[in-house]
Amino acid sequence: MGGKWSKRSVVGWPAVR
């Protein structure tokens, strides 16, 4: 949780879903 979205979590919240 946060490993793949380490960069996306900042500007990829909608991209995670």
Curated annotation (Swiss-Prot):
Location(s), subcellular: Host cell membrane; Host cytoplasm, Host perinuclear region; Virion; Secreted
InterPro entries, A to Z: HIV-1_Nef_anchor_sf
Lipidation (N-myristoyl glycine): 2
Keywords: AIDS, Apoptosis, Early protein, Host cell membrane, Host cytoplasm, Host membrane, Host-virus interaction, Lipoprotein, Membrane, Myristate, Phosphoprotein, Secreted, Viral immunoevasion, Virion, Virulence
Membrane disposition: Lipid-anchor
Keyword Membrane: yes
Origin: domain of life: Viruses
Keyword check for tRNA processing: no
Cellular component terms (Gene Ontology): extracellular region; host cell perinuclear region of cytoplasm; host cell plasma membrane; membrane; virion component
PTM annotation, UniProt: The virion-associated Nef proteins are cleaved by the viral protease to release the soluble C-terminal core protein. Nef is probably cleaved concomitantly with viral structural proteins on maturation of virus particles. Phosphorylated on serine residues, probably by host PKC.
Chain segments carrying region N-terminal: 2-17
Additional note from the record: HIV-1 lineages are divided in three main groups, M (for Major), O (for Outlier), and N (for New, or Non-M, Non-O). The vast majority of strains found worldwide belong to the group M. Group O seems to be endemic to and largely confined to Cameroon and neighboring countries in West Central Africa, where these viruses represent a small minority of HIV-1 strains. The group N is represented by a limited number of isolates from Cameroonian persons. The group M is further subdivided in 9 clades or subtypes (A to D, F to H, J and K).
Subunit structure: Homodimer. Interacts with Nef associated p21-activated kinase (PAK2); this interaction activates PAK2. Associates with the Nef-MHC-I-AP1 complex; this complex is required for MHC-I internalization. Interacts (via C-terminus) with host PI3-kinase (via C-terminus). Interacts with host PACS1; this interaction seems to be weak. Interacts with host PACS2. Interacts with host LCK and MAPK3; these interactions inhibit the kinase activity of the latter. Interacts with host ATP6V1H; this interaction may play a role in CD4 endocytosis.
Family label: Belongs to the lentivirus primate group Nef protein family.
Its biological purpose: Factor of infectivity and pathogenicity, required for optimal virus replication. Alters numerous pathways of T-lymphocyte function and down-regulates immunity surface molecules in order to evade host defense and increase viral infectivity. Alters the functionality of other immunity cells, like dendritic cells, monocytes/macrophages and NK cells. One of the earliest and most abundantly expressed viral proteins. In infected CD4(+) T-lymphocytes, down-regulates the surface MHC-I, mature MHC-II, CD4, CD28, CCR5 and CXCR4 molecules. Mediates internalization and degradation of host CD4 through the interaction of with the cytoplasmic tail of CD4, the recruitment of AP-2 (clathrin adapter protein complex 2), internalization through clathrin coated pits, and subsequent transport to endosomes and lysosomes for degradation. Diverts host MHC-I molecules to the trans-Golgi network-associated endosomal compartments by an endocytic pathway to finally target them for degradation.
Domain free text: The N-terminal domain is composed of the N-myristoyl glycine and of a cluster of positively charged amino acids. It is required for inner plasma membrane targeting of Nef and virion incorporation, and thereby for infectivity. This domain is also involved in binding to p53.
Name by which UniProt lists this protein: Protein Nef
Organism: Human immunodeficiency virus type 1 group M subtype B (isolate JH32)
Lineage: Viruses, Riboviria, Pararnavirae, Artverviricota, Revtraviricetes
Gene: nef
